[in-house]
Each structure stands twice: as structure tokens, then as C-alpha cells.
Regions:
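Short, hydrophobic/aromatic-rich segments at coil-to-beta transitions
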Residues: 42-52
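Hydrophobic ligand-binding cavity/cleft-lining segments
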Residues: 1-39, 137-142, 146-148
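Short, exposed beta-strand/loop patches in secreted or surface proteins that constitute
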Residues: 37-43, 65-66
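Generic structural detector for well-ordered beta-strands
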Residues: 9-13, 52, 64
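Residues that act as N-cap/strand-start positions at coil-to-secondary-structure junctions
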Residues: 4, 34, 45, 57-59
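Hydrophobic pocket/interface hotspot
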Residues: 18-23, 29, 49-51, 74-76, ...
Length: 148
């Protein structure tokens, strides 16, 4: 069993095609996961990124952006082992593991809420997903076309 296991998901009401620009921005990685060294194992563009993690933890981490409805679910996974030894006393070791997991869950949630805030912008709660500005304005589409 992996010592550090984090799995989280957040729905982002924004076009899935907007995800890659944010989650693949290396400057943001430093802010989100500053103490970890990240080596890209798989860059999936708008669908996310997979890393090999080193530093205070060794393992794998992933952001997967799954298109759902008119937005996407941002999945965050971290599976890792601490590189420094845990305390030898069982209760202290369990407390340390709990704290390490909490720190990484909080960091993941802060990351996902930042992605959500950036991409949803001033979207009205309950309103349609924020469109991709690079795509044509749906209002300018041919009025005779039928959407299915």
C-alpha cells in the first residue's frame, strides 16, 4: 500500500479545450507543488499531464481532465512515498502519514479551485459553461442550422 494516496475530482464548468493551457503551465506547477520535482511522463494536452515525482516524495502524480456535459471533471491523483524516514513509534508514524496526506490533499484542492476560478471566470452560477474563446461564437453560427 502506498503511504501517500490522494484522489480528488472537481467539476469545472468551462470548455474542456481550455484546460490544457492552465494545467500544462509549468509556472503554475511551481506554485501548486513547489517542493516537488516533476518530470513529465505523459503530456496529454487538454486532457492533462502525468508526472514522475521526486523530492520529499517519490512516486507518480496526475491531472486528468475528463470531458463531461458542457465542462470537464478535473481528476487529481498522487501516489507516493515520503523520502525521509517515518518515526519508529507507530502512533507518531501514523500521525505523520495522516499529516502528509492532508498537506497533499489541500494542495490538490487549492490547485483544482484555482483552475476552476481561472477558467469559469465570472460565469453565473447555474449558467452555461464558459466557452473556449478560441472557438467561434455560437451566436454567430448559421441560424438555419439545427443543433442535436
Amino acid at each position: 500500500v502506498t503511504t501517500i494516496q490522494v484522489a480528488d475530482e472537481t467539476f469545472v464548468a468551462a470548455a474542456p479545450t481550455t484546460a490544457g493551457a492552465v494545467v500544462n503551465d509549468r509556472a503554475r506547477w511551481k506554485r501548486w507543488f513547489g517542493d516537488l520535482r516533476l518530470e513529465v511522463v505523459e503530456d496529454r494536452g487538454d486532457q492533462g499531464v502525468r508526472w514522475r515525482v521526486s523530492g520529499p516524495l517519490e512516486g507518480t502524480m496526475e491531472i486528468w481532465c475528463e470531458a463531461v456535459l458542457d465542462g470537464f471533471v478535473l481528476h487529481y491523483y498522487l501516489h507516493a512515498e515520503p523520502t525521509r524516514p517515518l518515526p519508529s513509534e507507530p502512533a507518531a508514524a501514523m500521525a505523520e502519514v495522516a499529516e502528509l496526506n492532508k498537506q497533499r490533499r489541500v494542495a490538490g484542492k487549492e490547485m483544482s479551485f484555482e483552475v476552476k476560478a481561472l477558467l469559469e471566470g465570472d460565469r453565473e452560477i447555474g449558467g452555461p459553461a464558459t466557452p473556449d474563446p478560441a472557438c467561434a461564437d455560437p451566436a454567430s453560427a448559421d441560424p438555419g442550422s439545427v443543433r442535436g
